[in-house]
């Protein structure tokens, strides 16, 4: 089976590398000062689009207009709050965003230093047996055509579907079709190693989005709130006008040949509910301390990602991020993030759906699955503040073709072999849109895995044992003969480093 990993390493070399002009400042386009850019929507993708227009497109801030029907910036906390250490597109933009906490540093500097000094840890046991590992490797080699129209349950055994690995992975990436599952494995397999994920100092909104907003405001980008876009006119593959409605008045804005239009779009299905639990109850914190064997208020990363509750009807998963999660959080408070993949189903403790439940009832359901004695659940749940669930939808992309002066951004944009539920994906769509309309020649980063990446993941899935120790006696004899052929080589040293034998 190890040979499969070696072959797969060479197979995925096609993913790409890094070109020299990735590090070059793009040339300023002729007549760029005559351009105006209109971005329809003010979510994270729209903000990043404005950043690329400023930095790489050389547009003036006062020529960039962000238009949205919301009334303020407080609408931006993305669902997927974890960030992996291969978020190349996110890093590319954050390296240019000044920190609002430490003068002279960027947001990328700040996040990097934090995770070097206090890296995320994992408490998950997601090891796979040799049989299940073989299933996973075989799946890696399955062509996209063979997976068309199939669900994950159609290509894996029941044992695999009930494994801790699958529950963990499905909690992170709630996809059911086989192709999307394969995409997430190829793109994010490195997070299975001990330092595959990183975390910001506070929530994504305060650590990433607020600095971006301040960067845009400092460059005089124009925000139009309480303004609804009611119509976009497109003729012969060119956007000619769009209509807005504000304070009951409609206005049509005509676009010239120098104007650019960015349209936020998404395609959705399968609602997911999210709840933020805030507690200062020492009894709950004591239970969490015993369960996790770490103090939730220590300031370190606590759970190392999501913890799925396998037997939950709502398919709950939860995580305790680095505390404090908010800048203004009280010293003795603990914030827990709770997600329900099936909020429409009836709960196991609460006899109603998650969407129908009040905050304290959702908290009670979570405490029930933690194993808290039932005679104490109701009392403890009332001692915690819990927001009612808000819904997010797992996105299914469609192909959107850009026009001569307009481009699509956001989760609804189809990118080959990418998972749309990450911050990195959103930045990628913004970068593509700006670069295509302004014909920027700077290279777009591409992912590339090394053999060390695959061996590191392989080692994580084998657990404390070496790969050789997980094999049958007959297989060990064959593998020992193969190892004799590489004795004394760099490959032998590499295999030892990653616990192959």
Summary of predicted features, one role per range:
Residues 436-492:
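Active-site-proximal substrate-binding core of FAD-dependent oxidoreductases
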Residues 187-259, 265:
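Helical element adjacent to the flavin cofactor pocket in flavoenzyme catalytic cores
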Residues 54-75:
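Glycine-rich FAD pyrophosphate-binding loop
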């Amino acid at each position: 089976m190890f040979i499969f990993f070696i072959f797969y390493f060479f197979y995925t070399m096609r993913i790409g590398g890094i070109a020299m002009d990735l590090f070059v400042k793009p040339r300023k386009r002729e007549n760029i000062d005559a351009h105006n850019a209109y971005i329809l929507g003010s979510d994270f993708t729209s903000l990043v689009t404005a950043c690329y227009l400023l930095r790489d497109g050389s547009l003036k801030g006062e020529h960039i207009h962000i238009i949205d029907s919301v009334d303020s910036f407080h609408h931006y906390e993305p669902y997927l709050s974890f960030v992996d250490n291969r978020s190349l597109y996110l890093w590319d933009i954050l390296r240019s965003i000044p920190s609002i906490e430490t003068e002279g540093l960027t947001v990328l500097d700040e996040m990097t230093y934090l995770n070097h000094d206090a890296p995320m840890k994992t408490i998950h046991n997601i090891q796979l047996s040799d049989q299940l590992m073989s299933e996973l490797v075989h799946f890696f080699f399955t062509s996209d055509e063979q997976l068309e129209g199939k669900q994950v349950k159609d290509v894996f055994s029941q044992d695999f579907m009930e494994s801790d690995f699958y529950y963990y992975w499905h909690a992170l990436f709630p996809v059911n079709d086989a192709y999307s599952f394969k995409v997430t494995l190829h793109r994010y397999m490195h997070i299975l190693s001990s330092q595959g994920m990183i975390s910001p100092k506070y929530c994504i909104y305060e650590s990433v989005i607020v600095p971006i907003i301040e960067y845009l405001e400092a460059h005089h980008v124009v925000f139009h709130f309480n303004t609804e876009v009611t119509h976009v006119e497109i003729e012969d593959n060119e956007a000619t006008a769009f209509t807005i409605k504000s304070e009951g008045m409609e206005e049509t804005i005509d676009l010239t040949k120098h104007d650019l239009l960015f349209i936020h779009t998404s395609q959705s299905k399968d609602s997911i509910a999210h709840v933020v639990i805030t507690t200062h109850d020492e009894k709950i914190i004591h239970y969490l301390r015993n369960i996790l064997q770490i103090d939730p208020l220590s300031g370190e990363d606590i759970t190392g990602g999501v913890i799925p509750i396998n037997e939950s009807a709502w398919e709950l998963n939860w995580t305790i991020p680095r505390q404090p999660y908010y800048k203004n959080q009280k010293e003795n408070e603990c914030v827990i993030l709770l997600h329900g993949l099936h909020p429409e189903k009836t709960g196991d403790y609460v006899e109603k759906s998650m969407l129908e439940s009040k905050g304290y009832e959702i908290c009670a359901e979570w405490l029930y699955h933690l194993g808290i004695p039932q005679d104490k659940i109701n009392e403890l749940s009332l001692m915690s503040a819990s927001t009612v669930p808000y819904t997010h939808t797992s996105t299914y992309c469609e192909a959107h073709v850009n026009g001569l002066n307009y481009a699509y951004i956001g989760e609804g944009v189809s990118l080959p072999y990418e998972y749309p539920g990450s911050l990195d994906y959103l930045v990628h769509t913004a970068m593509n849109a700006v670069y295509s309309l302004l014909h920027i020649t700077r290279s777009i980063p591409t992912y590339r895995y090394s053999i060390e990446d695959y061996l590191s993941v392989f080692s994580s899935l084998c657990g404390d044992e070496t790969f050789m120790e997980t094999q049958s006696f007959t297989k060990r004899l064959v593998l020992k003969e193969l190892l004799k052929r590489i004795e004394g080589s760099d490959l032998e040293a590499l295999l030892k480093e990653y616990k192959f034998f």
